[in-house]
Amino acid sequence: MSRYRGPRFKKIRRLGALPGLTNKRPRTVRDLRNQSRSGKKSQYRIRLEEKQKLRFHYGLTERQLINYVRIARKAKGSTGEILIQLLEMRLDNILFRLGMASTIPAARQLVNHRHIFVNGHIVDIPSYRCKPRDIITSKDKPKSGALIKNSIEAFPREELPNHLTLHPAPYKGLINQIIDTKWVGLKINELLVVEYYSRQT
C-alpha cells in the first residue's frame, strides 16, 4: 500500500488531529466524532483506527509500519513504546518536531531535495534513524536556510520535547536523548496498534 496523498482534512475528520499530516484541526466536535453516528465500534475497528492514526501521522506506507512493528517486537522492552521511539527518531519527524518543517510531508521534501545535514553530511533519506548527540542543520545555501527560517517563524513550537534542543539562527537542532514517550505529539494507544498486527499474523 502506498503513502497516502489524498485529502488530508478527510482523514482528520475521521481519526482526529494528525499534526504530522496537516496543521489543520477538526473544526467542531462533530468533525472529531464524525463516525460516531454509525453506532458502537467493534474492537477490530478501534484497533484499525489507532493503526491508521499512526500510519497517517508519520506518513508511512503499510509495509513500512509493518517493518517497524517487527523491529520493535525483536527489541527488549515494551513493543509499543519501542515502536513509538523508532518512529519519533526518524529524521523527517525530528525536523517536524523541531519546527524546521510545518508537517512531516514538508520535512520529507526538505530531506529528499538534499537541504538537510546530519553531523555535517547531507542525508537524503527521510527514514534515517537519528540518535543522541546528532546535530541537524540546513545546507549552507540561502534557499535551504530560508526554507527552515520561514517554517520556524510561521509555525513556532510552543514547547519542544525534552529530547530536542533548537539553537537560534543559524538554526541548529540537537538530539539530546531517545524520546520519552510522554512527549509524543500524538494522542495514540500504541498497544492497540501492536494488537492489530498481532491478530493479522
From Swiss-Prot:
SUPFAM superfamilies: Alpha-L RNA-binding motif. Residues 89-149 form the S4 RNA-binding domain. It is found in: Plastid. One of its GO terms (cellular component) is plastid. One of its GO terms (biological process) is ribosomal small subunit biogenesis. Gene3D superfamilies: Ribosomal Protein S4 Delta 41, Chain A, domain 1, RNA-binding S4 domain. It comes from the Eukaryota. One of its GO terms (molecular function) is structural constituent of ribosome. The keyword RNA-binding applies. Belongs to the universal ribosomal protein uS4 family. Part of the 30S ribosomal subunit. Contacts protein S5. The interaction surface between S4 and S5 is involved in control of translational fidelity. This is Small ribosomal subunit protein uS4c. It comes from Cuscuta exaltata (Tall dodder).
